[in-house]
C-alpha cells in the first residue's frame, strides 16, 4: 500500500471517529434548542401547576412548550428539561430575594410521543393533523440513529479492509459515510424547519428568546466531517485500485 493512500486512510479514520463521537454526543444530550426567560418566582401556585402538567403523561405539545418557554427550557431528541426553583413553597410566598437555588428537571419523550401526530393548532386535537410537522419530527430523531448505524457498519467494513490489507473494500465504507452525512444533514434540516414551524404556531412570550444549543452544533459539525471522511475513503480506494491495475498491466506487457 502506497504511503499516500495509507495516510489518507488514517486521516479518514480519524475524521470518522470524531464525527461518530460528535453524533453520539448530540443524540445523548438535551441541548438541541434552548430558551432563555426571566427567572420565575418560586412561590406561586402557577409554577406547581405548570410543573405537574409538564411531567404528566397526558402533556400535549402546547402544555410542555409553555413550560419550556417559561422556565428556561432545553430540548433534545429524547428529553425536555426545565429549570425550576429548588425549594417550592406552596403554602405561602416567601420574601423575594435577589436569587434562589434552581434545579434542572427533565422528562423523557416516550416512543408514543415521538410518533404522535402534530396538530395544526398545537394542543387543539380538533384542528386537524399537521402532516409536515409530524414527519419532520419523526425524521429529526430517526435520521441521527440511521447515520450512527451507517458509520458503525462502515467501520466494520474498514476493519475488514485492514485485516485483508486491501483498500478496495473501503469504497463501501466511503459510500456508507456519504449516506450517513446525508442523514445527518437531513436531520439538522428537519430540526430547523420543525422549530421554525413550531414558533409560527406558538409565538415566544415577551422577554423570552430561543437559540440552537451545542448539541445541535455538534450534529452540524458531524455532517461535514462525515463527507470529508467519505471523500478520503473513496479517493484512496479508487486511486489505489487504479494504480494497481495499471501496474499489473505494465508487468504483463
From Swiss-Prot:
Major site of localization recorded for this protein: other
Transmembrane domains' residue ranges: 5-25, 141-161, 175-195, 216-236
GO cellular component term, pick one: apical plasma membrane
Keyword GTP-binding: no
Compartment(s) where it occurs, according to its Swiss-Prot or TrEMBL record: Cell junction, Tight junction; Cell membrane
Family affiliation: Belongs to the PMP-22/EMP/MP20 family.
PANTHER family assigned: CLAUDIN DOMAIN-CONTAINING PROTEIN 1
Role this protein plays: Plays a role in negatively regulating the permeability of cells to small molecules.
Name this protein carries in UniProt: Claudin domain-containing protein 1
Amino acid at each position: 500500500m502506497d504511503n499516500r493512500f495509507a495516510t489518507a486512510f488514517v486521516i479518514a479514520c480519524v475524521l470518522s471517529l470524531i464525527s461518530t463521537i460528535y453524533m453520539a454526543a448530540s443524540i445523548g444530550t438535551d441541548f438541541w434548542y434552548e430558551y432563555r426567560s426571566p427567572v420565575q418566582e418560586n412561590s406561586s401556585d402557577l409554577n406547581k401547576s405548570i410543573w405537574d402538567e409538564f411531567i404528566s403523561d397526558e402533556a400535549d405539545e402546547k402544555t410542555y412548550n409553555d413550560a419550556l418557554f417559561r422556565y428556561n427550557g432545553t430540548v433534545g431528541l429524547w428529553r425536555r428539561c426545565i429549570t425550576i426553583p429548588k425549594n417550592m413553597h406552596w403554602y405561602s410566598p416567601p420574601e423575594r430575594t435577589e436569587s434562589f437555588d434552581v434545579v434542572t428537571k427533565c422528562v423523557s419523550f416516550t416512543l408514543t410521543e415521538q410518533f404522535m401526530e402534530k396538530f395544526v393548532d398545537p394542543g387543539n386535537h380538533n384542528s386537524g393533523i399537521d402532516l409536515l410537522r409530524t414527519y419532520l419530527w419523526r425524521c429529526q430523531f430517526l435520521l441521527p440513529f440511521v447515520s450512527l448505524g451507517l458509520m458503525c457498519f462502515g467501520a466494520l467494513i474498514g476493519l475488514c479492509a485492514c485485516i485483508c490489507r486491501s483498500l478496495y473494500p473501503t469504497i463501501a465504507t466511503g459510500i456508507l459515510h456519504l449516506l450517513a452525512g446525508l442523514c445527518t444533514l437531513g436531520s439538522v434540516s428537519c430540526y430547523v424547519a420543525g422549530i421554525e414551524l413550531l414558533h409560527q404556531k406558538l409565538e415566544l412570550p415577551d422577554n423570552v428568546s430561543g437559540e440552537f444549543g451545542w448539541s445541535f452544533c455538534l450534529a452540524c459539525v458531524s455532517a461535514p466531517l462525515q463527507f470529508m471522511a467519505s471523500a478520503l475513503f473513496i479517493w484512496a480506494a479508487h486511486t489505489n485500485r487504479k494504480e494497481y491495475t495499471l501496474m499489473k498491466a505494465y508487468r504483463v506487457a
